[in-house]
Amino acid sequence: MQKKLLVVVAMSALLGLSGCGLLPDKTDETAKWSAEKLYAEARGEMSSGQYAQAITLFQRLESNYPFGTYAAQAQMEIAYAHYKAQDQAQALAAVERFIKLHPNHEAVDYM
């Protein structure tokens, strides 16, 4: 009797664990967005005071389009968003990273 119970419990556990793989993974809706759309959405989040979401979108923009026209701007915006979110340490780190990556950029003096 105990052997049958053990087999039933083991089979139930296996079925339960195998079912976890059937659930769809969370998809990133921004994965197929253009650089322009990512930038516009991030700026919109900044305008509405949603700095954490803006930072996430700017980081996604920078990682998806590292050599695009918005990459350097996204880095500057990340620093500004951290500053606006009262996170001075992260803002300073973002500024230092920008200066290290773009020492001759026209906006370095304003960082």
Segments (PLM) and residue ranges:
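Bacterial signal peptide processing site
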Residues: 21-25
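Short solvent-exposed coil/turn linkers within tandem alpha-helical repeat scaffolds
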Residues: 29, 64-71, 99-110
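C-terminal motif of bacterial Sec signal peptides marking the signal peptidase cleavage site
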Residues: 16-19
